[in-house]
Amino acid sequence: MNNLFSILHNTPLFQEGTIEFYKPLKPLTSYKIGGPAEALFCPKDEDHLKEALIFLSKNKISASLIGGGTNILVSDKGFRGVLISLKNLNKIEIIGESENKVFVRAGAGVLTDKLTKWAVENSLSGLECFGGLPGSVGGAVFMNARCYDVSISDRLKSIKYILADGDKTEFAEYEYNPSDWDYKASPFQQNPVSTEITKNRKIVLSAVFTLTHGIKEEIAVKTEEKVQDRISKGHFKEPSAGSTFKNNRAFGLPSGKLIEDAGLKGLCEGGAQVAPWHGNFIINKHDASASDIKTLIEKVQKTVKDKTGFLLEPEVIFAGDWG
């Protein structure tokens, strides 16, 4: 900590107001769980991010990414090194039109819910199903978020990203190709999916979406329907990361139903609980630790596997220092 502080504190690149040391992360995640970041850095723009990535690589300082904090479980130890937030990449703009198509660029730091509200205000259709979705545009693209049978990739035209490669770190453009995408999978994920910025990591900076002109009132109604549906299903009743496990069509039933049929709704581990109202939500019920949540996830996996033969795949990313 002291060594990292002395390096970054005395480097003009990490100017005052863009970096915080030993930053508590609980308020920044939907789980309200996890240890601190040794350093949390918010670059002011894309060029600032590029300079920082080159500096961190040159000085062999580990780095990770955080988006909206809604699909991650931060370890109780938190993050070593520098955790980078792209919240300042928050611009939304129309960049072109073709017939009835409208091309909208949104920065990675834009909150998805803010983008859907912006689309309503500008009478643009195509994002209604993402109304009320927590998280950021960068995270939604990275995870290929899927809501009500529509994936974020279904609306993509192109993506600007940065390829992390030491002193060769550079900006690049990606044109949407459907063969690169799958159910909650994108060409920007590594295997295993991680928040860590490793060599050749592709970091989403902005995305261009293809939308269409529509009637503002109709778009607003459809968007609000999704918001209210999330509320009625208890998405926001307790701190959680939403769906804990991916669905798998080969299993014949949604993950939540498999968990419910295994008699696991309401099961507790420390302060963590399988939500009594939804089998696929694991919630922070009583000041749970990250270890409580992870242990409960593993218990659910084992029980469902023992009863059905199916191994549920977590959608939640285990982030930070789990050593």
Swiss-Prot record:
UniProt xrefs under PROSITE patterns: FAD_PCMH
UniProt keywords, alphabetically: Cell cycle, Cell division, Cell shape, Cell wall biogenesis/degradation, Cytoplasm, FAD, Flavoprotein, NADP, Oxidoreductase, Peptidoglycan synthesis
Keyword flag Flavoprotein: yes
Cellular location(s): Cytoplasm
Family matches, as Pfam families: FAD_binding_4, MurB_C
Cofactor: FAD
Domain FAD-binding PCMH-type: 33-214
GO cellular component: cytosol
Main subcellular location: cytoplasm
Catalytic residues, chain numbering: 243, 315
Keyword Cell cycle: yes
Record pathway: Cell wall biogenesis; peptidoglycan biosynthesis
InterPro entries: FAD-bd_PCMH (IPR016166), FAD-bd_PCMH-like_sf (IPR036318), FAD-bd_PCMH_sub1 (IPR016167), FAD-bd_PCMH_sub2 (IPR016169), MurB (IPR003170), MurB_C (IPR011601), MurB_C_sf (IPR036635), Oxid_FAD_bind_N (IPR006094)
GO molecular function: FAD binding; UDP-N-acetylmuramate dehydrogenase activity
Reactions mediated catalytically: UDP-N-acetyl-alpha-D-muramate + NADP(+) = UDP-N-acetyl-3-O-(1-carboxyvinyl)-alpha-D-glucosamine + NADPH + H(+)
GO biological process, one term: cell division
EC number: 1.3.1.98
PANTHER family: UDP-N-ACETYLENOLPYRUVOYLGLUCOSAMINE REDUCTASE
Function recorded in the entry: Cell wall formation.
Family, per entry: Belongs to the MurB family.
Protein name: UDP-N-acetylenolpyruvoylglucosamine reductase
The species this protein was found in: Treponema denticola (strain ATCC 35405 / DSM 14222 / CIP 103919 / JCM 8153 / KCTC 15104)
